[in-house]
């Protein structure tokens, strides 16, 4: 290859996109040169070339008025060719001179290339090997100069035009780019503002005076390849506006012929002299019509990779692409509009004729006639025969396809190139017609009419990609994601506002499209999902509750009547009003409600009343949540969360006794369905503060049970009644709310009045006797002591009630804490069996520590269970398995004890599904039927083989497991569905929201956590997250590359564990 030539793969502009008709063409607003028509004298002498073009001249007369650009490419008309000397328009020579001046200038700093010592470099080229290696060592992986220039000098050179911008940059700018490592520039390079050539061009006609200072040398004129002749001056004496020259060509240069001038101009744009074959190689015997048919209408060379325009003219693919990009999308022959995407391959017969065309071999030693399709191989054989020192091969003549090059040129004076004022003037009549049509047919919607016209025009032009984009925008879809989708992604990936905004800007800058929505649109979407947006009404109105519906996050202490003697509350609390939160949750389930009505074949318009909503309430303390940051008052570093879950929605039709369930929560123990209501920094053992905060919640709850909610669902007003079931509490919280003594009390159970001794003697036969109303009556007896009894007698009468119950709880068993409590008990049994406590009644503390260490090592070895300080849900699930007890039995010496342990675990594993299952009658009917028998067998085994441990004592949860599970399942249908597991999982979300995207202030962070947690549980957003699950995982890995340690499951406080 010759030096300086490019192959099709290595071409400097190979990365230019195929869509040369840029959609922002109208924004560029190129200023076109104004060309005035010229009257010239008739032609006296015609050259043979001009005579050959007589048919073209006749054809031109029938077409539109010729332009200067048509003159460039051989189009002749009376207005353009009338001079005896065949001179062309002077403006063409001015542009040619302007382009030659640009070739000597630096694109980046504007200085002359000769002033910067060192080689020049192609702006649109690829990196040389030395430059690429130098930048690669500094971490830059770019491969083309346009990318490096954009990165270093912040200049986009991919849209440069040859008639406006220089194509080279100097060695100084190259040095600056290399020193900056391809990322930045350490020199302050001022980028010139390159403008198209005009009559006042500063480059061609510099305004600088000839003398810079008195007494100095005259400045040297700018070097140029062409010396401009004298400027024309206009003679306005005649109305024909003839152009005359002031001197008779003083330089002695003769005017170039029109065809020669045209050829020079084309060479500057197509640059295909070395790549395309001349038509002179065709034998003279070939008819002239055939030669014209196989000749490119742009470069006058033999067709290379021929394409055909819709107007039936033939061009080289590379030449027509460069031509349209430089001078506008017009056909060089007929001046019709030409879209490069509409170019097609000619007919196969024509291509076969072109391939079989005989050509004369250009080699002097050879005079063979060679077919065009084998011409390249024939020439290669000649070059291989020459053994030259220079490695020059004929692959210079790229006879394959050619890559488009971003060459410039002044565009045709098109509608898009006009100013806004000129566009309005030109389209005034059309605008009036469209407006009249829109008012008559489309109700005055001019925008829709114009967009539809544009859409139809794109479809007619086969530009379906752009048409699809326009149609998506018209339908409101567009490229960008819906604000609700962006909100769902932000909430579920735990992004703070600043993190999301950074992602939004990065994606927008990288892709050039606004895929993600800005933060203000997300805030608008939030308002519809948060409580306080939807209107509603209560009939009758709620007692002691405001009738306003637009209530957001409020202070948790609002509604607390403060007396003079009260001290300020040592807590911070934020909550939603209970009724407002329930309304927002129902509106979030609106689609599910309507879908349930359709599935049950119920008439939507008839179902406006009789709806019943069952709500599960949960409350739990989170323990220590201390943070190092946070301004505000000193508050306890413990927190309590109160939440609710809509379990089911049913409707009772008129005349029907049974209700029809139209919505059933499929995941009642998921954190996605457990909605937060109240957050507070308070110790759950602080009865007074907890009562003060939850008191207003209890009042709102009581008022709602006596009223009906009227709300619009599915476009119709419908009435709902609410039933609340407080089941998501652990035993500690139940005792706190029902006013019972602590869990170490003699009265072991929160469901019956049994003492610990009674429960150990009779482990199975007990029934539920406690209730909220009974506890209130017993509190009054405890407070008043009407029978004047002693303390022990009074305590025995009230069965462990020692404080006023302030919230009604459902007498039930919490499945999660039952698992944790029973696993803790089994862990202690395993220790005792390893140490053979049945033979040693009073072991020392050191012995117990040794047994525990042995058990931990065995569980770590066999079950991969790491020791924990407090029993949690995950550990309990792994411990209560057949594999775990078999591993423990390896450490038990006695065969009889091993069999007893295995039987004990087998019985437990048969009973466990009954209280863990969401619907035991469906999921495990056999275990449900055998539960009473299994529990009796379990109790007998404890009383006999493990009497050393259960002689006069038993744990609280073990008593409930053996005595009360069948009764609860018979009454409620399930225990597992009403567990507190969802609230416990929500505790982990509290910590994560607090760490990731909450303001670092105790006063405001509760509001942020409450808001984000509510959005996290939105069913509406969860549907979007299902569709975008994979993108969310990728984004979460991008913004949170370091995995945060999993929060431990909330534990049951077992002091001796």
UniProtKB/Swiss-Prot annotation:
Its EC number is 3.1.-.-, 2.3.2.27. GO terms for molecular function: endonuclease activity; histone binding; magnesium ion binding; metal ion binding; protein homodimerization activity; sequence-specific DNA binding; ubiquitin protein ligase activity; ubiquitin-protein transferase activity. In the adult, predominantly expressed in the thymus with lower levels in the pronephros, mesonephros and ovary. InterPro entries: RAG1, RAG1_imp-bd, RAG1_Znf, RAG_nonamer-bd_dom, Znf_C3HC4_RING-type, Znf_RING, Znf_RING/FYVE/PHD, Znf_RING_CS. Residues 1-21, 39-61 are annotated as: Disordered. Residues 408-475 bind DNA. The keyword Zinc applies. The keyword Iron does not apply. Residues 1-12 have a biased composition (Basic and acidic residues). Zn(2+) 3 binds at residues 311, 313, 331, 334. A divalent metal cation binds at residues 620, 730, 984. The RING-type zinc finger mediates the E3 ubiquitin-protein ligase activity. Homodimer. Component of the RAG complex composed of core components rag1 and rag2. This is V(D)J recombination-activating protein 1. It comes from Danio rerio (Zebrafish). The gene is rag1.
